[in-house]
Amino acid sequence: YGYHRQTSPNIDTFAKTAAVFENVHASDVPCLPSRTALLTGRFGIHNGVVNHGGTDADPVIDGAGREFWSRLQLESFPSQLANGGAPFRLNQDNMRTVSISSFAQRHSAFHWYAGFDEAYNVGKFGLETADEVYAIAEDWLTRNGSKDNWFLHVHMWDPHTPYRTPKAFGEPFADEPLPKWYTEEVRAQHWDGCGPHSARECYGFAPNPAMA
């Protein structure tokens, strides 16, 4: 949305008949803070996760008041979803909640699994392609799709770097001119920057150089 090249025709077609919010702001970014906010229903300043690393990349612990099940287990969105908005309770005819995602592995964020009845890790740290994820989802749906009362979360990484479109797609934008704002001065400024997904690390980075 808002990009000058036609890189997402299917999403654009969907958007023509969908609601577009012009003044919406994410409460917590990027990936790890946003997922934790989604899971807990709380801002990062309250759940403890506001960064990808350091002391602010793990949920706050319950402390001395923690019971057998943690607050994450009792109040995470899968638990709330399964209980119609109420905290988790055992021995109920709950909605079955399932996640197919390598997010927890990629970010060492295993609190993401809290409240899910089933969790499937594709095992490639988010470098898997949609067909690999879909194969697991298709198998689960074949076995369970005809049942009632379930929620299936399927996480595909293809829109995320490194962008892995099939080779058959070619380079459809190779001959298109660059936008007018992209001057040599702008290019040099970005090139001198640093960090994951910057101009010099456009494909991301490996936490351990030996894994790169």
Labelled PLM ranges:
Residues Y1-A212:
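Catalytic domains that recognize anionic headgroups
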